[in-house]
Amino acid sequence: MGRYIGPWVKLDRRFGVVVSGKKSAPKILARRNYPPGQHGRKYGRRKKLTEYGLRLMEKQKLKFLYGGLREKQFKKYFDMASKSKENTGEMLLQYLERRLDNVVYRLGFASTRRQARQLVAHGHVLVNGKKVNIPSYLVEPGDVIEIKEKSRDIPFIKENLENVDPRSIPSWLELDKDNFRGRVVRLPENVQEYLEIPINLQYIVEFYSKV
């Protein structure tokens, strides 16, 4: 499956929760809280899903929350998590959180994960002093993530940092705002406590166990 390129507000309306990360999305969803499409307003309520449909929906919500990952990539994280001795669902979230584009987003350099992916892909981000342009790069404890010096004058990066609330940064990360730099203190834990939307991880585990 290719990457989704349609309007992200439609995804918010499809799922009934904000997966786009856009600041305006909650207001739009409150005003148009019905499925997108020609008959969305007419029928209003979302169709009752089958057991399979519920599990598929939960998987899709998590994929799009993390920027619209391709199925192959998402399944790779699930397979890695399922081989761990730890809880599969929690390990899946840990791998997703450790993605470089997610860390750039969590530190406040980007306003959405999609914007963070672009920053990484276009070479604006350094890890331990070296350019890394792979959004899926998995960070490790001790890694230092920073915006390249020549990129620090990009208006939206400066604006994002000025508006970041230090309390919104997970405890496994540290931010040095003045130096456009962050550090991975430890591996992420209890991710569901600060995840932007509720996710039923058991549904995702059950989805892949039946396909």
UniProtKB/Swiss-Prot annotation:
Q: Can you name this protein?
A: Small ribosomal subunit protein uS4
Q: Which organism is it from?
A: Aquifex aeolicus (strain VF5)
- Which GO molecular function entries does the Swiss-Prot or TrEMBL record give? rRNA binding; structural constituent of ribosome
The alphabetical list of record keywords is: Ribonucleoprotein, Ribosomal protein, RNA-binding, rRNA-binding
Quaternary structure note: Part of the 30S ribosomal subunit. Contacts protein S5. The interaction surface between S4 and S5 is involved in control of translational fidelity.
Domain of life, per UniProt, equals Bacteria
User: What function does the entry list?
Assistant: One of the primary rRNA binding proteins, it binds directly to 16S rRNA where it nucleates assembly of the body of the 30S subunit. With S5 and S12 plays an important role in translational accuracy.
Q: Which residues form the S4 RNA-binding domain?
A: 98-161
| A Pfam entry, by short name | Ribosomal_S4
Q: A single GO BP annotation from the record?
A: translation
- What InterPro entries has UniProt attached to this entry? Ribosomal_uS4, Ribosomal_uS4_bac-type, Ribosomal_uS4_CS, Ribosomal_uS4_N, S4_RNA-bd, S4_RNA-bd_sf
Question: What's a GO cellular component annotated to this UniProt protein?
Answer: small ribosomal subunit
Please report which protein family the annotation says this sequence is part of.
Answer: Belongs to the universal ribosomal protein uS4 family.
